[in-house]
């Protein structure tokens, strides 16, 4: 304000914090894995080229997963080959970004769960960066992506999609 009775005065907003670009990748590829070792999820990645080296990348992940039995699924986020926002292994505990467990009885192989998480990353580059997620499961289990574990042909099972959004936030 410039004083009582005067019209309001406005100042320009600060330059930082603006969204410069948004890249979204949807993945409807149905796949599965039965590995206790982390492996890339087929078709699940997004690439973005920051316009400035001090930009941050805000990432939103959602994964539609199923498990074939009462077990655990573990997920690690990556920028290229660098693990981001993930714990390290500790003794027999598995380090991961997020995890999912199923303990819901015999009909759970007809169900999917959406695993969602966000990360703010500082890649410090103007080169293209690719973000992926790797998954692993407890020994003897199978994780399914974008379908239920048994993929029954009935009105109770789903075939959802997964996706990643990458937003460049200017400094």
Language-model-detected regions and their locations in the chain:
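Glycine-rich, low-complexity segments
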Residues: 1-30
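Terminal beta-strand-rich extracellular "head" domains
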Residues: 25-26, 32-34, 49-128, 132-171
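Short, solvent-exposed loop/turn segments enriched in Ser/Thr/Gly
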Residues: 40-42
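Extended, low-complexity regulatory regions
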Residues: 44-48
């Amino acid at each position: 304000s410039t004083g009582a009775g005067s019209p309001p005065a406005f100042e320009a907003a600060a330059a930082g914090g603006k969204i410069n670009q948004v890249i979204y990748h949807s993945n409807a590829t149905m796949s599965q894995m039965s590995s206790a070792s982390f492996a890339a999820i087929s078709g699940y990645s997004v690439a973005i080229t920051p316009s400035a080296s001090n930009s941050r990348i805000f990432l939103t992940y959602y994964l539609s997963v199923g498990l074939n039995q009462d077990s655990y699924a573990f997920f690690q986020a990556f920028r290229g080959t660098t693990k981001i926002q993930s714990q390290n292994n500790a003794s027999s505990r598995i380090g991961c970004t997020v995890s999912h467990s199923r303990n819901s009885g015999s009909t759970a192989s007809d169900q999917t769960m959406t695993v969602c998480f966000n990360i703010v990353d500082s890649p410090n580059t103007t080169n293209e960066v690719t973000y992926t997620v790797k998954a692993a499961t407890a020994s003897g289990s199978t994780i399914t992506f974008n379908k239920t574990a048994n993929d029954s042909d009935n009105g109770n099972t789903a075939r959802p999609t997964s996706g990643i959004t990458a937003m460049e936030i200017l400094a």
